[in-house]
């Protein structure tokens, strides 16, 4: 198959964790990967590693520019067959210690950008009678705790948006799924920035390469057995 005929997978939130490993997994399966991140250097690294991939510097909270990037990907690569919405923003702070504007910023990245991406990509998916949209989430999508008033509402809304899309477009050939990752993910950022994570054993973390494998598996499900809500956690995670 010529490179121009290979399907395109679009991934937001490319980094050294879930986003990067998901890009590797889809590239391994023969996809051309359109990668979105805020850091050019990170994108260059993955472009060099994954032949046929292409990086786009984009802050998904800039909704007008996000739409511009979607058009650019369609023109330069082709309409994405798969969207993995992995970009995330969260502030973990008690209500009275935080700032109300945090909620709006988090909402734009976690939820509104998914709406914009879906609104742009779904018409081509409908035309082709196939497509996959997967959003990655966490337990904040299912419950709020004292330190998540600026984060949990945005993830809950993200999940409900995904559910609405699944109910609308599933019968039309588009598979929409929501993956809840119920654990800390083993990345350098998690290890170095969160004090109580530094000395944890690897088995206490969800491994990003394993998450990526599950994301890919879900994207390939047969139409008679599609998943929507999928929960991933290490075997020793309490839940």
Predicted ranges, named:
Residues 171-180, 198-239:
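C-terminal helical subdomain
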Residues 12, 80-88, 110, 135, ...:
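Rossmann-fold scaffold of SDR-type NAD(P)-dependent oxidoreductases
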Residues 31-45:
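Conserved glycine-rich Rossmann-like NAD(P)H-binding loop of the short-chain dehydrogenase/reductase
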Residues 118-119, 163:
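A short, exposed helix-loop element centered on a Lys and neighboring polar residues
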């Amino acid at each position: 198959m010529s490179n121009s005929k290979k399907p395109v997978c679009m991934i937001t939130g490319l980094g050294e964790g879930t986003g990067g490993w998901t890009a590797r997994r889809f590239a391994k399966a023969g996809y051309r990967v359109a990668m979105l991140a805020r850091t050019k250097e990170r994108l260059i690294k993955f472009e060099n590693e994954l032949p046929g991939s292409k990086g786009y510097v984009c802050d998904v909270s800039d909704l007008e520019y996000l739409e511009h990037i979607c058009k650019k990907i369609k023109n330069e690569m082709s309409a994405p067959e798969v969207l993995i919405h992995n970009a995330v923003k969260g502030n973990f702070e008690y209500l009275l210690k935080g700032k109300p504007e945090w909620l709006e910023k988090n909402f734009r990245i976690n939820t509104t950008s998914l709406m914009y991406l879906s609104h742009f990509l779904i018409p081509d998916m409908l035309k082709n009678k196939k497509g996959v949209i997967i959003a990655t989430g966490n337990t904040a999508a299912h419950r709020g705790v004292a330190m998540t008033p600026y984060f949990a509402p945005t993830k809950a809304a993200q999940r409900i948006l995904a559910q609405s899309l699944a109910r609308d477009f599933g019968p039309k050939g588009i598979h929409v799924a929501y993956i809840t990752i119920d654990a800390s993910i083993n990345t350098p950022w998690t290890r170095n920035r969160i004090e109580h994570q530094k000395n944890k054993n690897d088995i206490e973390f969800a491994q990003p390469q394993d998450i990526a494998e599950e994301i890919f598996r879900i994207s390939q499900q047969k139409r008679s057995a599609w998943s929507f809500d999928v929960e991933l956690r290490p075997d020793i995670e309490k839940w």
